[in-house]
């Protein structure tokens, strides 16, 4: 069930404490996938949340749940425009950037590392990951940390707590709509 996966993997985005989350969703049929995506988006669109399928293969969809207003803010942070320009992003417009990311994902098997920007990872950590080929990090949580370890550890704790609370509330009968904070 798509809603359960969103709660388990994207609670910090629903709670508006993180820009976006990414997860792989197994589906039975294309019709079921698109019906679930459309239903989810209808449910949370007015609260500023959007679910996008970035890539599909072998009945698995790579799903990105985000707050476009937060993504717009993140793409305008100092240094981000110059960083993503190296990967062919000609604009920091969120819709354009997301389409460019989708295109980059279609061109390769692995993840383009700039995806961290879309997931609210600090620019320094994204750059550190690339420069160090994923090695030599200070700590690992939701991402590999190369810069501000203390802040990252606090963020990881907030995200874990949020997910724990959201899973509990969802299991008690709260809907995704009820659990999604308005923008």
What is each of the regions a protein language model found here?
Residues 86-113:
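Internal catalytic-core helix/loop-beta-alpha segment
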Residues 45, 131, 135, 164-168:
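Generic secondary-structure signature for well-ordered alpha-helical cores
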Residues 75-77, 103-110, 133-134:
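Short acidic alpha-helix initiation/capping motifs at coil-to-helix transition points
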Residues 2-57:
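A structured, charge-rich N-terminal accessory region that forms the first stable segment of a protein
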Residues 112-137:
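Hydrophobic/aromatic-rich, well-ordered segments within soluble, folded domains that form packed cores
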Residues 18-20, 59-61, 112-114:
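Short, surface-exposed beta-edge/turn micro-motifs
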Residues 37-95:
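A glycine-rich, hydrophobic loop/mini-helix early in the fold
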Residues 142-183:
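Long, compositionally biased
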């Amino acid at each position: 069930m798509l809603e359960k996966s969103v709660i388990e993997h994207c609670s910090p985005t629903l709670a508006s404490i993180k820009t976006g989350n990414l997860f792989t969703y197994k589906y039975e049929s294309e019709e079921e996938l698109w019906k679930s995506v459309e239903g989810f988006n209808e449910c949370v669109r007015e609260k500023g949340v959007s679910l996008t399928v970035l890539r599909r293969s072998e009945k698995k969809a790579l799903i990105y749940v985000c707050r476009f207003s937060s993504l717009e803010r993140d793409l305008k942070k100092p240094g981000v425009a110059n960083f993503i320009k190296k990967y062919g992003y000609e604009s920091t417009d969120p819709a354009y950037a997301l389409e460019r990311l989708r295109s980059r994902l279609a061109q390769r098997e692995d993840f383009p590392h700039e995806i961290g920007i879309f997931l609210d990872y600090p620019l320094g950590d994204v750059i550190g990951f690339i420069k160090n080929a994923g090695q030599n990090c200070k700590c690992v949580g939701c991402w590999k940390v190369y810069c501000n370890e203390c802040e990252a550890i606090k963020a990881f704790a907030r995200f874990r707590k949020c997910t724990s609370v959201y899973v509990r509330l969802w299991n008690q009968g709260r809907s995704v709509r009820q659990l999604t904070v308005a923008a």
